[in-house]
Amino acid sequence: IGYMKGGGKALWKDENLADSITTHALDFIKANKDKPFFMYFATNDVHVPRFPHDRFRGKNPMGLRGDAIVQFDWSVGQILDELDRLGLRENTLIILSSDNGPVVDDGYADQAEELLGDHKPGGPLRGGKYSAFEAGTRIPAIASWPKEIKKGQVSDALMSQVDWFASLAALTGSVLPKGAAPDSYNYLGTLLGTDNADRPWVIEQASDHTLSVRTKDWKYIETSNGPKMVPWGP
């Protein structure tokens, strides 16, 4: 997936990706520990192709997909440990999320589906990645900030990742330029757990361009008679 720019000097080993980006993340945190910073940690786990490092192989009964999840857990743990070591954990906002719902068989022969067992990545929800149904568009979102967020809270408020732009701008006291991010709304209180305000609606789009509208209690998916964009999509 993707390409390498720079010829042979740019070659990388997939098995080393997690180590590499985690090391860069830790170096960034150490270099900026004395001032406010923003870090976006875009891991390749558990995306295909799944090539966890050898030390994580066989750690999970779900095969390479499960091992990649273990590797991702390690990466997150390394970052949290570094924040603790530097005394930054208490006053650091961490948001963990995904950009789409789950997919198991993504066209790679890695036995992800065969070894899944009774586990259902989308839970009781219908569909998955590529789909307009809930398992495709509803995603996990975890926020941690020991100094400001009371731990153990669970919210069923309707919010979109689009809203993080305006919400984090409000948190940092930033004034957005006129016309910037017009679809983003400030739901900082919802993110921090100080209230449970809902977005009135969210517009969603599947990979075949099917549009849907999600409100607090209802979802409308426009009818579509076209072919599936990918043969393995729900």
Region spans (language model):
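Formylglycine-dependent
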Residues: 1-36, 43-52, 225-227
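Short glycine/proline-rich turn/loop motifs
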Residues: 2-10, 54-59, 144-149
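The substrate-binding groove and active-site-proximal loops of carbohydrate-active enzymes
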Residues: 7-19, 58-71
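A structural signal for well-ordered alpha-helical segments within the folded catalytic domains
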Residues: 19-23, 70-77, 159-166, 182-185
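Active-site His/acidic residue clusters
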Residues: 25-67, 103-105, 109-112
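Loop/turn elements at helix/coil->beta-strand transitions in domains of secreted/extracellular proteins
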Residues: 32-39, 88-94, 137-139, 196-200, ...
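Metal-dependent active-site segment of extracytoplasmic phospho-/sulfohydrolases and closely related
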Residues: 72-109
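C-terminal cap/loop subdomain of S1 sulfatases and analogous C-terminal strand-loop tails that border
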Residues: 102-134, 148-153, 157-234
